[in-house]
């Protein structure tokens, strides 16, 4: 280690939304911006140009407001329609039942990064990008990070906020291959319903449509989870054939699907491994990657950042990291369990699916159950 005067308090590896939110929150909690370092392999311009759609919960909006990263261009979700294809029964979660302006919001990754980058800049946070961490050495009093330009950055604590982890593999890590691939695109419909999101369970996996205003005011962000071989077929179809397949899977609640953007895909799996050592900890995607059903991955990561910032604001010490691990167990366990159960329970065929479809209708009549699910989706386990 170098002289402690040159050692920063917290190095955050990964300047995605979760890493930047943590940095801005640490500054908000009183840590000097010059004592916080953000390290990322991407240039800021590359991150800002990312067109992916992301879902933010109402709780995440509150966090962004606190650090001056809200408002941003986003479409509000007022209600969520949940159904099972081919079976009776559906459930509706509505903002009017929960005294909030929206259940959540749909925005583009680049819009969120732009806002968070501005918050970090105003806080005077040190940003090192593009740069990769090629190695690390943990000492009793800190961690030395080796960067790809040959330099060394010394920190009291290191937070892995994206990608791999520094800590040892947790023997209780939960991994799962869903044998599903998510096909993503932006699509337009002939008769949209403003501010309504859909979660439609099919034999191969969930199909989500999230309202996202485009130039025609009729656009949705599509996340369609299917078997890998089906995903390959969908990617090869021309636009007309793709829209026809989508209409068959979703139904006619929004009229006809009239246009689609280019499509992309990514493999789905569960990897919940919140690895940690005395001076390193993983949050966000480095701690858990979830199935996209219910859109909880980023929001769970932002809750990680909020709790960690609160604790490290009391001191950048191993004791605070240990307390963080304990404090996040319940929310992580419930959110991971909920998304995993939903992804697996509604995929498949057979008589059980009819019962599951009917269960949505029963669920819709039980106000306390709907309220609990909405609370978990907006704020996590508090």
In which residue ranges do the predicted regions lie?
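Conserved N-terminal helical subregion
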Residues: 5, 75-170, 176-182
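FAD/FMN-dependent oxidoreductases across multiple families
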Residues: 233-300, 306-318
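C-terminal helical "tail/cap" subdomain of flavin- and related membrane-associated enzymes
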Residues: 309-382
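N-terminal FAD cofactor-binding segment of flavoenzymes
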Residues: 48-85
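Glycine-rich FAD pyrophosphate-binding loop
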Residues: 25-51
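Conserved FAD-binding catalytic core of PHBH/FMO-like flavoproteins
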Residues: 157-254, 258-263
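Beta1/beta-strand and adjacent pyrophosphate-binding region of the FAD-binding site
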Residues: 3-16
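N-terminal Rossmann-fold NAD(P) dinucleotide-binding loop
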Residues: 19-20
């Amino acid at each position: 280690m170098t002289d402690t005067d040159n050692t920063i308090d917290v190095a955050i590896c990964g300047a995605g939304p979760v890493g930047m939110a943590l940095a801005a929150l640490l500054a908000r909690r009183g840590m000097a911006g010059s004592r916080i370092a953000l390290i990322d392999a991407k240039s800021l311009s590359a991150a800002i140009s990312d067109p992916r759609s992301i879902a933010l919960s109402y709780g995440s909006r509150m966090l962004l407001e606190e650090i001056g990263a809200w408002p941003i261009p986003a479409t509000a979700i007022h209600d969520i329609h949940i159904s099972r294809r081919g079976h009776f029964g559906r459930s509706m979660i509505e903002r009017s039942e929960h005294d909030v302006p929206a259940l959540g919001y749909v925005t583009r990754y680049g819009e969120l990064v732009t806002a968070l980058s501005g918050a970090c800049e105003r806080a005077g946070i040190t940003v090192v990008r593009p740069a990769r961490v090629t190695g690390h050495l943990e000492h009793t009093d800190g961690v030395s990070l080796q960067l790809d330009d040959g330099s060394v950055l010394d920190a009291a604590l290191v937070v892995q906020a994206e990608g791999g982890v520094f800590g040892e593999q947790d023997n209780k890590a939960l991994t799962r291959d869903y044998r599903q691939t998510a096909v993503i695109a932006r699509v337009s419909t002939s008769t949209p319903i403003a501010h309504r999101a859909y979660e439609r369970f099919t034999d191969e996996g969930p199909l989500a449509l999230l309202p996202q205003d485009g130039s025609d005011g009729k656009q949705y962000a599509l996340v369609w989870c299917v078997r890998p071989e089906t995903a390959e077929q969908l990617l090869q179809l021309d636009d007309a054939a793709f829209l026809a397949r989508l209409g068959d899977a979703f139904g006619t609640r929004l009229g006809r699907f009239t246009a689609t953007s280019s499509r992309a895909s990514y493999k789905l799996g569960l990897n919940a491994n919140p690895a940690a050592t005395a001076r390193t900890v993983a949050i966000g995607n480095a701690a858990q990657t979830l199935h996209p059903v219910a859109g909880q991955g980023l929001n769970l990561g932002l809750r990680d950042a909020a709790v960690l910032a609160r604790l490290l604001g009391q001191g950048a010490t191993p004791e605070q990291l240990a307390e963080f691990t304990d404090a996040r167990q319940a929310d992580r366990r419930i959110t991971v369990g909920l998304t995993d159960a939903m992804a697996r329970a509604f995929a498949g065929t057979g008589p059980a699916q009819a019962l599951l479809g009917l269960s949505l209708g029963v669920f819709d009549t039980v106000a306390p159950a709907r309220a609990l699910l909405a609370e978990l989706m907006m704020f996590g386990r508090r």
